Amino acid sequence: MGPYQDVPMALRPSVSGTDPGVPMASSGADLSAQSAPPPQPAPVSTAAQPPSQTQQPQVSTPSQPSWGQTPGSGESQWDQSPAQLESPWDQAPSQPPSHDQPQNGHPQQQLRQAKSPRILACQLCQGRKIRCNRVFPCDNCKRSNVPCIPSKPAPLRKRRPPHQALQEKLAAVTEKMEQMRREMDAAKASGQGLAIPATPAPTTTSSWDSKGNPRLIQEEGGVRFMDSLLGTMYQELGEIRAMVDTSPDDGSDLILGADTPTFDPMSSWPQPGAVWQLCDIFFQRVNPLMKIIHRPTLERYVAEASSGPFGLRPNIRALFFSIFLMAIVSLDADECAQRLGYHREQALQDFAQGARLTFVRMGFLSTNDLTTLQAFTLYLTSLQGRSNPHATWVLLGTAIRLARKLGLHVDGKRLGLPPLETEMRRRLWWQLVVLDAKTATISGFKSAAVVRDWSTELPRNLEDTDMHPDAKEDFVERDGPTEMIFCLMSYKATDFLLTSGQDFEGVMIAADLPGGQAPGSDDQRHRRTVEQLALELSAFTDRYHLHPANGPVHALAFKFKEFFIKKLCSAKPQPPPTSDQQGFNDVDRAFRLAIIDLEHHELNMLNDDPAFFWFSRVYFQPFNFMYVVSQLCQFQAPSASDKHMETASAKTDLIDRAWRQISFVYRLNPDLFDTSNRLYSQIARKVLEAWQKRSEALLRQTGTRPPAPPYVEKLANILGNNNINSGSLGGTRTDTGTIPTATTLAPTAGTGLAGGNDTSSLMPGPSAGTGPGAASVPTTHALGQGQRPEPPPFMEGVVNYMDPNMAFAGNMWGDDGFGDQFQQPQMPMMDMMEDATTGMMYSGPPYYYPDTEGDGEPSRGMW
């Protein structure tokens, strides 16, 4: 390009002796010929002179070269840029001149009408980044006595038609969908695909497979599993979404709450020494029971994490927050204060907030990252026993969906993944399956939410040090003891319960009860299934040398195996009762199921290792425990003249088992002694009341009063009741502790109970006579004082679903020590509340305590 491409005609120096204001004559030279190098421009005056009449610009034609083109040269010094060819200097007027200006007007008027081209600074001024007056030669070049060469504008890029790329992608996707439609139409025309055959249809050679092709699709942030038909077009669809999608929101705040702009991760991050301690606690107490973290890989980040969170990637930061949270969960309040100097509840709140906000900021719902799912699984485990169990189970469904999105339900070998990733995916998937099964039971469901349609194999018996990240061949499984033993045992037991297809919950409720009939089970089939499981577990333990002497993890796994087999073997179906036999009623069976649930928490105590006590605490449900204690106030030891001695003996055994579990619960959960918590205070009063009745019953039978257990004495001292063994409760309670009967709670006319299922009249509130100042409910029931009544209709849900909240509520309604302390709310059942500890939003009806602040409003309690 020429050095004067953007210089006005009046300011251009003369070239080859020609007058600068006169255009060159057309030479008719070949346009493809090389142009001669331009001579050095002669100095001209910096003062621009008005152009003369002869300096009027001329119109360039194909036979006449434009300005800047040397005679005899076909190539312009402007390089024939499209923008330059379309410059007003080279274009003829597109319309006749107007009447107010003559056609041959003054050139200065034509210059004003034309848009002046942009004049760039010279090359020297651009390189030095100094101001250029854009008059060539410029002042700077003249002072430096160097040639002043104007700069060349950047060439314009060739623009593609608008949305051409999007149209091409849409055309490709449309063509593929058309091809699929034609194949489907052909299949329908041949009679296949219209009806579902009774036998599997023969495979066809069509490229369209109804089962899809499982694959991992690479995308930003990780990989995504897809096995549907649209997976074949995912790449094209993904590029199209990238062109048109402008919404970055993934909805994470809908689950974990909105982001807090003022939150600083450093404010919740522990000190460097505490980071090492928390990680060590996690690997000692949590990791042996939840082998979802590869320890050698994580240890490479510990040193970096000790210096602060900002050098870590968001997924690693979320993982460390969850590890810190689980480490605090595994400690009790005294251990937390002694080892770390933390207040346990405050540490739980800080680390939980750090984990939640990290999840929200990284948009964890839209990420396809295994580390993020590991962190989220640990976070959900930490919520067990600290938040609403129903909300936790709902959140666990989110984790399972994320796992399916990552393809964890398909074995990694089938997907061609490396051995280490394959093994860690197996561990994480089976941990989610076990967690879902446990949480579903606590939430009141008989079966887990996850569907048994996965192909993920059970994890191998391997130590973390056996798995190297760079391994290419499959790992060789160990035959000796490893830390995986407890996880493998729980995976095996859960898989048995999910695949057996039997209602073992119903079997266990009815087992050992006189006249109990195991619902929907066959004696021979049940016996064969349990024997087969016992053989499999025996072979399993023999192969991996399961023995308590191999360490605390093996001791816990050994107790778990014995407990599991014992319960299943004892849960054999019983013959139906005869006409003169009296079996257990629904309340008795619900009471037994609640005791069995508490016996599961006894499991860790059998190991006598405090490091694993947390595993029972996280699944402890205080409302289920309250239900057992409340029932102990109703159960009375049968007399020697009881007609149905077999039933009486079974009930006595249940009472003894319940009191043994109460002792274990107070040993496992020292927080229950904190009577500043209103719920724990009411439980403590109920325990004292139940023990008082048991003590009196044993006194009548044996003539001696049994000594009070240590936890009863401690509760009596805390509550100021020092006469527990003398039969006095300090005058604090005068009610009989009986539950209301159907007669007491009988609805009046028009309530709809007789003709329907409306139980609104059975839900006491401020208007039902249970609030402060309301009339008390009579404690003498229609069946007589001291006689246990049949449960009202609304208690049917306790037996069908064993929802601890329902069982608790059913035994609190009425003046039995809880009815005068709680009021059923006059508000929708799906009231949303925020837990101060976890910050989660969950649903559930709260209870209202009496007005303790004197403001006329009842105090609100958590459900």
UniProtKB/Swiss-Prot annotation:
Induction: Expression is induced by ketoconazole treatment.
Gene ablation phenotype (knockout): Increases azole susceptibility. Reduces the transcriptional response by cdr4 to ketoconazole stress and increased cellular ketoconazole accumulation under ketoconazole stress. Decreases the ergosterol production but accumulates lanosterol.
Annotated compartments: Nucleus
Residues annotated to bind DNA: 122-148
Compositionally skewed regions (Polar residues) per UniProt: 67-84, 97-113
InterPro entries (alphabetical): Sec_Metabolite_Reg, Transcription_factor_dom_fun, Zn2-C6_fun-type_DNA-bd_sf, Zn2Cys6_DnaBD
Name of the protein this chain belongs to: Transcription factor ads-1
